[in-house]
């Protein structure tokens, strides 16, 4: 079964790069540039196995989106990315049970390894 990943970030270059790497690893990918767009995907059917989410988004933080997802009993795993780490964000991410926390910039192989550790291999990999 092909695992699904939603990438949420307003930096289009990052979205394209991460999408490409995860597609190559065999994951089904969707992308959103804001929390509002992400919600349209997240509450759809079937659910995503994983959400890779930037904390700094237009109008709303990634932490705020995670809070709503957890309140709505969304079971997707979450990797929170941030270039602006603060003790408050890190603490809130832990409280909301964010599965992984990545500081930007990060090595793409680290991201792929984290994705695999959380939801397993992609399946249907073009890489073989």
Spell out what each predicted region is:
Residues 12-30, 96:
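Two-component/phosphorelay signaling modules centered on CheY-like receiver
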Residues 63-74:
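Short amphipathic alpha-helix used as the core "switch/output" element in two-component signaling
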Residues 31-50:
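Acidic, metal-coordinating helix/loop segments flanking the phosphotransfer/catalytic sites
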Residues 64, 85-100:
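Alpha4 helix (beta4-alpha4-beta5 surface) of REC/receiver domains from two-component response regulators
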Residues 33-34, 61-64:
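Acidic catalytic/metal-coordinating carboxylates
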């Amino acid at each position: 079964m092909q695992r699904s990943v939603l990438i949420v970030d307003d930096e289009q270059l990052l979205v394209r790069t991460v999408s490409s790497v995860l597609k190559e690893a065999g994951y089904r990918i969707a992308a959103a540039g804001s929390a509002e767009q992400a919600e349209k995907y997240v509450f759809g059917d079937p659910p995503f196995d994983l959400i890779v989410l930037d904390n700094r988004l237009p109008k709303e933080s990634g932490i705020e989106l995670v809070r709503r997802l957890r309140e709505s009993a969304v079971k997707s795993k979450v990797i929170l990315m941030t270039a602006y780490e603060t003790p408050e964000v890190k603490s809130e991410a832990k409280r909301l049970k964010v599965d992984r926390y990545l500081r930007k910039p990060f090595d793409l192989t680290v991201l792929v390894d984290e994705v695999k550790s959380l939801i397993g291999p992609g399946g249907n990999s073009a890489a073989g």
